Amino acid sequence: RILFLGAMIGFFFFTTQYLQGVLNYRASLTGMAFLPMTMVNFAVAMVVPQLTRRFGNGRLLACGLTLCLAGMVWLSRATFDTSYLTSVALPMVLIGAGQGMALSPLTTSGIAGVAPQDAGAASGVVNVAHQLGNSLGLGVLVAVAAVGAGALDGRELLAYRVGTALTAGSAMLAFALLIVCALIVRPRKSAQAVASGANA
């Protein structure tokens, strides 16, 4: 959760910087520019319960992280002279779908297997991880964005820094995906295989 939220808060922060500082969007237009992500996020989140019953939390979480990763990598390629539609809006669609698909399974996985008497404490840990991901993740990405590109200035410099930060955010998502596959998806597949063998 720390890695995922760190990458996502970086996405919101640096994409806003890109839209206002590079594409010269006003604040109101910048807010509207996030609509592709918001609408897809809402639509996907509405069908998460059905998807969870069909595919399980682990697979759904891995798929959501994969979509977010693909969108973040795509968005990180935006430069000072690329268009909103192909460099921002379409990656946002992937990120919105990934967020809508991942957030609920991410929370569920954080408290899965916890005894009923410890559910409150587990929920608290999940929320702490959420807040730490926001603050620490953004701090790391801002520090990474400030490195290099001494020869650039103006819009070109800002676009470079946004791209650098989003690339680092992509690395955080890739690491989160590896953790999910190793600690959530694979153990559940093994448990299902053992259960199937026992029933046979």
Predicted regions and their residues:
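Transmembrane core module of solute transporters
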Residues: 1-107, 115-117, 169-170
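Transmembrane helix-loop junctions in multipass membrane proteins, especially transporters and channels
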Residues: 50-54, 80-84, 147-154, 184-192
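Membrane-embedded alpha-helical segments of multi-pass transporters/permeases
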Residues: 73-77, 135, 139, 143, ...
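Residue-level recognition of specific faces of alpha-helices
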Residues: 5, 11, 121-125, 143, ...
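Transmembrane-helix exit segments and adjacent C-terminal regions of multi-pass membrane proteins
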Residues: 97, 108-109, 155-200
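Loop-to-transmembrane-helix entry motif
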Residues: 6, 33, 128-135, 162-169
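Small-residue-rich alpha-helical segments with characteristic i,i+4
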Residues: 88-157
